[in-house]
A protein has these predicted regions:
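A short beta-strand-turn-helix
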Residues: 33-58
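Thiol/disulfide oxidoreductase modules built on the thioredoxin-like
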Residues: 103-109, 116-163
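Short pre-active-site segment immediately N-terminal to redox-active cysteine/selenocysteine motifs
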Residues: 56-58, 62-66, 97, 129
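C-type cytochrome heme c attachment motif
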Residues: 65-72, 132
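Structural recognition of the beta-strand scaffold that forms the well-ordered cores
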Residues: 58-61, 89-93, 112-114, 135
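Sec-dependent N-terminal signal peptides
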Residues: 4-13
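Structural microenvironment flanking redox-active thiols in thiol-disulfide oxidoreductases
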Residues: 71-109, 117-124
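N-proximal helix/coil linker or "cap" segments that precede and/or mark the start of modular domains
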Residues: 17-40, 169
Length: 169
């Protein structure tokens, strides 16, 4: 019995280590790209118009229609897109079929939206849990990453404002 408990405990620790990486005390369900060059933005299809990303901060939200926390984030992402429209482009990327995303009526997405059923960028980032957000500066460097509602590490308007002020060209 003790062997089984030890094996289960070791398996849980291994799984936890595999699924999350520490980032200044923040748990990530992805590989950390903080202060590193962001991978190339890859999408299969734009549901919205394609944004002009030149000289902009880019907030990318990996999400799905079935994900409760992802849907909870949409109104706040809408607000970020409005509040920081001069400096920030918000993009939601789902790996679901375009029809599935278009069927979702509430909440309404008011920012740029794209589909990548192959999850190319999501795989490059090693994302294993959603929602997962990265904020990229105009030079292509990741300046914020993670689960936007993680206690003590929330992505807020103040956080975005501070990053824009710090890393704006």
């Amino acid at each position: 019995m003790k062997k089984i408990i030890i094996i289960i405990a070791l398996a849980m620790v291994s799984l936890q280590t595999f699924c999350q990486e520490s980032n200044n005390g923040k748990q990530l369900w992805a590989n950390s790209f903080l202060n590193k060059k962001a991978p190339e933005l890859v999408v299969e299809e734009w549901i919205s118009t394609k944004p002009d990303l030149k000289d902009k901060f880019i907030l990318i939200d990996f999400w799905a229609t079935w994900c409760g926390p992802c849907r909870k984030a949409i109104p706040e992402l809408n607000e970020f897109a409005k509040q920081f429209k001069k400096d920030l482009i918000v993009i939601g990327i789902s790996d679901e079929a375009v029809e599935k995303v278009k069927q979702m009526k509430e909440p309404v997405i008011e920012y740029y939206s794209a589909i990548d059923t192959k999850a190319t960028m999501k795989k490059t980032l090693g994302v294993t849990g959603i929602p997962h957000v990265i904020l990229i500066d105009p030079k292509g460097i990741v300046r914020w990453e993670g689960f936007p509602f993680l206690g003590g590490h929330e992505l807020t308007a103040d956080v975005i404002k501070g990053l824009i002020e710090k890393y704006k060209k």
